[in-house]
Curated annotation (Swiss-Prot):
Domain notes: The DPH-type metal-binding (MB) domain can bind either zinc or iron ions.
GO biological process: protein histidyl modification to diphthamide
The name this protein goes by in its record: Diphthamide biosynthesis protein 4
UniProt keyword Phosphoprotein, yes or no: no
Highest taxon of the lineage: Eukaryota
Knockout mutant characteristics: Resistance to sordarin and zymocin.
N-acetylserine found at: S2
Subcellular location: Cytoplasm; Nucleus
GO cellular component, one term: cytoplasm
Chief localization: cytoplasm
Binding site for Zn(2+): C113, C116, C152, C155
UniProt keyword list: Acetylation, Cytoplasm, Iron, Metal-binding, Nucleus, Zinc
Length: 172
C-alpha cells in the first residue's frame, strides 16, 4: 500500500483520524452528496484532489469496519515510519546511543540510516557528545539524560539520540 502523494481515507472523508463511527458515517454521506456529479456544477467539482465516488466508498468501507480500520491505521503508521516520520510528539525518531556502533580508531559513533539505509549515514564524534554535556546545565538536563540532534548525511532524516554519562566512582 503506497500513501506517498495520495490522500488518506481520513482526508478523503475530511475527518480526523480519531473520528467516531457516527462521525465517519455522517462524513461519508455528506461527502457523497457534495461530490455526486448530479448535484454539482462543473465549476465546483472536486477536481483538485481528484476525489471520486469510488474513493469515497472505498474510504468508508475501510474506516467503518473496526478491524479493517485498525489494519489501515497500522499501514499508515508503517508508511510514515518508512518516510522518516514518527508519531512521538516532535516528529523525530528517538534512538539510544547504545544503538550506534563505536569506532575506537576514529572515536566516532555510527549507525546506518533507518530511512535511506545509507551505511554510516549517522555519525558523530565523542567530542560532540562532550560539547552537548558542557552546553546543558543541571536544570536543563532531562531526567533520562542528554539528547543530541543529528541529521543523516545522505537524506533529510533527523534523529534524537538519547544518552547519559556514567559517573566515575572514587577509588576505582
Amino acid at each position: 500500500m503506497s500513501l506517498v502523494n495520495s490522500l488518506t481515507h481520513y482526508e478523503i472523508l475530511r475527518i480526523p483520524s480519531d473520528a467516531t463511527q457516527d462521525e465517519i458515517k455522517k462524513a461519508y454521506r455528506n461527502r457523497l452528496l457534495n461530490t455526486h456529479p448530479d448535484k454539482l456544477s462543473k465549476s465546483i467539482h472536486d477536481t483538485v484532489s481528484n476525489v471520486t465516488i469510488n474513493k469515497i466508498q472505498d474510504a468508508y468501507k475501510i474506516l467503518s469496519n473496526i478491524k479493517t480500520r485498525r489494519e489501515y491505521d497500522r499501514l499508515i503508521l508503517e508508511n510514515y515510519k518508512r518516510q522518516g516520520f514518527h508519531n512521538c510528539g516532535d516528529g523525530l525518531d528517538e534512538f539510544s546511543l547504545d544503538d550506534f556502533s563505536f569506532d575506537e580508531d576514529k572515536l566516532e559513533f555510527m549507525m546506518n540510516c533507518p530511512r535511506c539505509q545509507f551505511v554510516g549515514g549517522f555519525h558523530f564524534s565523542e567530542s560532540l557528545l562532550d560539547e552537548c554535556i558542557d552546553n546543558v546545565d543541571a536544570m536543563e538536563r532531562s531526567h533520562s539524560g542528554y539528547q543530541l540532534l543529528t541529521q543523516c548525511s545522505a537524506c533529510s532524516l533527523w534523529l534524537k539520540v538519547n544518552f547519559d554519562i556514567e559517573e566515575e566512582q572514587e577509588g576505582q
